[in-house]
From Swiss-Prot:
Organism: Koribacter versatilis (strain Ellin345)
Signal peptide: none
The organism's taxonomic lineage, starting at the top: Bacteria, Pseudomonadati, Acidobacteriota, Terriglobia, Terriglobales
Official protein name in the record: Small ribosomal subunit protein bS20
CC per GO annotation: cytosol; small ribosomal subunit
Keyword Ribosomal protein: yes
Region (Disordered): 1-28
SUPFAM superfamilies according to UniProt: Ribosomal protein S20
UniProt keyword terms in alphabetical order: Ribonucleoprotein, Ribosomal protein, RNA-binding, rRNA-binding
Function per UniProt: Binds directly to 16S ribosomal RNA.
């Protein structure tokens, strides 16, 4: 356990930030799972709405520092290819 006031404060800040990052990561992963399920399911309209929501959440995760911008870009590119393949049939 930290003894200095500044170390105690940093520990508190770390707990707060960890909880916030965990919530944002969980929200993002849930949305990704929903999109992948929709792609596997088949309804093209649902896939498009899920995709737009997923892209929005990925961009928000980048803004909040949860994801690196290149990681989010990679996710979006791969998901976009899967959505395009699914909706073009």
């Amino acid at each position: 356990m930290a003894n200095h006031y500044s170390a105690l404060k940093r520990a508190r800040q770390t707990e707060t930030r960890t909880a916030r990052n965990r919530a944002n990561t969980s929200r993002m992963r849930t949305q990704l799972r929903a999109l992948r399920t929709a792609i596997a399911g088949g309804d093209a309209a649902q896939v498009k709405t899920e995709f737009s929501g997923t892209v929005s959440l990925l961009d928000k995760a980048v803004q909040k520092g949860v994801l690196h911008k290149n990681t989010a870009s990679r996710y979006k590119a791969r998901l976009s290819a899967r959505v395009k393949a699914k909706t073009s049939k």
